[in-house]
A protein has these predicted regions:
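Hydrophobic positions in the central parallel beta-sheet of the AAA+
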Residues: 6, 36, 140-142
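Short polar catalytic/cofactor-binding loops
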Residues: 7-13
Length: 158
């Protein structure tokens, strides 16, 4: 399995440029890899004061475009994380797992918000951690500060 970890310069307060650049890099990397992993909040960076207008939904064009890349290139994508507004109206720091057929097979909302960045002022904490299958592999998602809490990984392993 060939895995690409996408690293890009995220411009503060310039979602349009971030999305265009991220999708371009994703399309290029997906041609040569089996799995593509994007970074946390790659569409917005930590311009958290702009989340009300910058938050995605599950039906957003960004996820649809990543799904199209996955389907066209037969490359699974862990879509980093994006600020996502859910049906409850709250914004979560959400990671989508997209299989090589372009189907979203898991959405994970960051559970442990990082106090130093005051994430709790902008994001709601998730509680939906579960293992999932991505193109035949058993996987689990976590985001950044979640790594400080081993019980989350223990739960995913069981």
């Amino acid at each position: 399995m060939k895995i690409a970890l996408l690293q890009l310069e995220v411009l503060e307060k310039n979602k349009e440029a971030n999305v265009a650049h991220g999708l371009q890099l994703a399309a290029e990397a997906a041609k040569k890899h089996d799995l593509l992993v994007l970074p946390e909040v790659w569409t917005t960076g930590y311009s958290l004061g702009h989340l009300e207008q910058d938050a995605e939904t599950q039906a957003s064009p960004v996820l649809a475009q990543l799904a199209e890349i996955a389907r066209n290139e037969q490359c699974a994508i862990l879509a980093g994380s994006v600020p996502m507004r859910h049906a409850d109206g709250k914004i979560y720091n959400t990671s989508a797992a997209i299989n090589k057929n372009g189907e979203i097979v898991n959405l994970y909302d960051k559970v442990h918000l990082f106090g130093l960045f005051h994430e709790e002022d902008f994001f709601a904490p998730g509680n939906n951690f579960q293992a999932f299958t991505l193109d035949g592999l058993c996987c689990g998602s976590t985001i950044c500060y979640d790594l400080r809490f081993p019980e989350l990984f223990r739960h995913l392993a069981l």
